[in-house]
Swiss-Prot record:
Belongs to the class V-like SAM-binding methyltransferase superfamily. PANTHER family: HISTONE-LYSINE N-METHYLTRANSFERASE PRDM6-RELATED, PR DOMAIN ZINC FINGER PROTEIN. Residues 51-63 have a biased composition (Pro residues). Residues 247-366 form the SET domain. It comes from the Eukaryota. It is an enzyme of class 2 (transferase). Gene3D superfamilies: Classic Zinc Finger (3.30.160.60), SET domain (2.170.270.10). Its main location: nucleus. Keywords: Chromatin regulator, Metal-binding, Methyltransferase, Nucleus, Repeat, Repressor, S-adenosyl-L-methionine, Transcription, Transcription regulation, Transferase, Zinc, Zinc-finger. The keyword Transcription applies. Residues 37-50, 77-92 have a biased composition (Low complexity). It comes from Mus musculus. This is Putative histone-lysine N-methyltransferase PRDM6. GO terms for molecular function: histone H4K20 monomethyltransferase activity; identical protein binding; zinc ion binding.
């Protein structure tokens, strides 16, 4: 028997020649202390396993479904097949051979890149995402002791001497899980009770009778379709949230790596289509602050008319939510096709583009998201007389303003640095709640390039990166404390000035009410240069400012000649004269006659 302490010993076991050939095909390079695998008749020499040379990495495989499947759709566990030991081998010999084969398999698995590892490799790559990335490759592995895993030597190293394998992941493979897409497959549910024989596979539509264009396909389907026993079997019981799935959408496997299921369009969805409302459990901000909700993946915020956080809608529990919980969030603006809209106290999804059939629905905020929450982009250029070019390469998109900056720019899909323009700050929050008049329309002020300052150029992006921490974007403007999530910043009570939490993003002034901040932000807007000296409001024209100042002074220069009423504006006088019963002339009283 081979002892663990013998570094170069060998053990000769009687093994069937077919079994030897099987392992030689699996490990063609061999791995014994004295060289490759040796066979003498029916004898096999197994030594200490050596690491194998890693083969060239193929394209990355589809990631493992990290999310558990919904109720009623749990797949069967995958069966593991192994080569059985020959009957002529004794129990002890079989166990020794299995141990040696497992050691060789472990050495070979540790030398393989992530692309050739089993399906659990993407999960291991996601588990060490917080570890600082090496310049080119990322070493993945599990450490026996506490602390993060560290990279070993060169490629193909087994581990740290304790039998723990380590793996290597390139930046391209990590980029796949951040920006790539996996294959999407439609999951048939048969939740509709229409006759399957009348469904056209080419038109993807249910018809009464044969399809006029693809009729012969139905006859063939009935002949070679399901058997009578399978057709007589009742359909599986579907979860409650899947029974309400409309015909316009269907369940599918998500294209976002690491997610199991998603929702795709079963037919073309036109731009402007509303989906909702989003169903879930109402949670107070205090309950979320206590940390009761662990999974915030299906959590939406509801704000009142003043912009104050009112409550949350949690769709994490499938029994109390709907199928909309499986509409995933878009990772970048290129794959977004839905925008989230708050109408009164409900959450709806609105199609921002025409969604073709077979496309997964992905939702995110619209461009007015930063304006609503008062998140101005921090200006780097301090020179007021800065010469601004007449054209701008590309405006900063929503994700650039909200997502943290990565330490390395190699993972960017485009690989190019972009110029950023400081947008105009609106005088009020455009993403506000609606009254009974109609749905919400998220407006956004257009950018005036001549009056704006360029935040960054392709040569000064290092300054922009230094303004923000690597993984902490949400920063308090008074105590400069940073947070990883925006909700944590909203629940933060600043110790520096708790009575005036609303701070201007352009200057150091802070206010106690959001309305005061909105009135103050107008003073920084460049398109309203005429400012009132009484209340501080700014206007775009001098005439509008003069009409406004008369409301403070009480001056009424516009006088009606018939009834002698005075008005502050000429439009008020004109409207007064057009009203038939409003302007009444003053009747002169007759002169009195004195009688002697």
């Amino acid at each position: 028997m081979l002892k663990p302490g013998d570094p170069g010993g060998s053990a000769f076991l009687k093994v069937d020649p077919a079994y030897l050939q099987h392992w030689q095909q699996l490990f063609p390079h061999g791995g014994g202390g004295g060289g490759p695998l040796k066979a003498s008749g029916a004898a096999l020499a197994l030594g200490a396993p050596q690491p194998l040379q890693p083969p060239p990495p193929p394209p990355p495989p589809p990631p493992e479904r990290a999310e558990p499947p919904p109720d009623g759709l749990r797949p069967r566990p995958a069966s593991l097949s192994s080569t059985p030991a020959p009957s002529s081998t004794s129990a002890s010999s079989a166990s020794s051979c299995a141990a040696a084969a497992a050691a060789a398999a472990l050495a070979g698995l540790s030398a393989l890149p992530v692309a050739q590892m089993p399906v659990f490799a993407p999960l291991a790559a996601a588990a060490v995402a917080a570890e600082p990335l090496p310049p080119k490759d990322l070493c993945l592995g599990a450490s026996a002791g506490p602390g993060p895993a560290k990279c070993g030597g060169g490629g193909g190293s087994v581990g740290d001497g304790r039998g723990v394998p380590r793996f290597r992941c390139s930046a391209e493979e990590l980029d796949y899980y951040l920006y790539g897409q996996q294959r999407m497959e439609i999951i048939p549910l048969n939740q509709h009770t229409s006759d399957p024989n009348n469904r056209c596979d080419m038109c993807a539509d249910n018809r009464n009778g044969e399809c006029p264009m693809h009729g012969p396909l139905h006859s063939l389907r009935r002949l070679v379709g399901t058997s009578s026993a399978a057709a007589a079997a009742p359909p599986p019981e579907l979860p409650e949230w899947l029974r309400d799935l409309p015909r316009e959408v269907c369940l599918c496997t998500s294209t976002v790596p690491g997610l199991a299921y998603g929702i795709c369009a079963a037919q073309r969805i036109q731009q402007g289509t509303w989906i909702g409302p989003f169903q879930g459990v109402l949670l107070s901000p205090e309950k979320v602050q206590t940390g009761v909700v662990r999974n915030t993946q299906h959590l939406w915020e509801i704000y009142d008319q003043d912009g104050t956080l009112q409550h949350f809608i949690d769709g994490g529990e499938p029994s109390k939510s709907s199928w909309m919980r499986y509409i995933r969030c878009a990772r970048h603006c290129g794959e977004q096709n839905l925008t989230v809209v708050q109408y009164r106290s409900n959450i709806f999804y609105r199609a921002c583009i025409d969604i073709p059939r077979g496309t997964e629905l992905l939702v995110w905020y619209n461009d007015s998201y930063t304006s609503f929450f008062g998140i101005p982009l921090q200006c780097i250029a301090q020179d007021e007389n800065l010469n601004v070019p007449s054209t701008v390469m590309e405006a900063m998109c929503r994700q650039d303003a909200l997502q943290p900056f990565n330490k390395s720019s190699k993972l960017s899909p485009s690989g190019q640095q972009r110029s950023v323009v400081f947008p105009q700050t609106p005088c009020s929050r455009n993403f506000s709640l609606l009254d009974k008049s109609g749905p919400m329309e998220a407006g956004f002020n257009q950018i005036n390039v001549k009056n704006q300052r360029v935040l960054a150029s392709p040569t000064s992006t290092s300054q922009l990166h230094s303004e923000f921490s690597d993984w902490h974007l949400w920063k308090c403007g008074q105590c400069f404390k940073t947070f990883t999530q925006r909700i944590l910043l909203q629940m933060h009570v600043c110790t520096q000035n708790p009575d005036r939490p609303y701070q201007c993003g352009h200057c150091s002034q802070s206010f106690s009410q959001p309305s005061e901040l909105r009135n103050h932000v107008v003073t920084h807007s460049s398109d309203r240069p005429f400012k009132c000296g009484y209340c501080g409001r700014a206007f775009a024209g001098a005439t509008t400012l003069n009409n406004h100042i008369r409301t403070h002074t009480g001056e009424k220069p516009f006088k009606c000649e018939r009834c002698e009423r005075s008005f502050t504006q000429a439009t008020q006088l004109s409207r007064h004269q057009r009203m038939p019963n409003e302007c009444k002339p003053i009747t002169e009283s007759p002169e009195s006659i004195e009688v002697d």
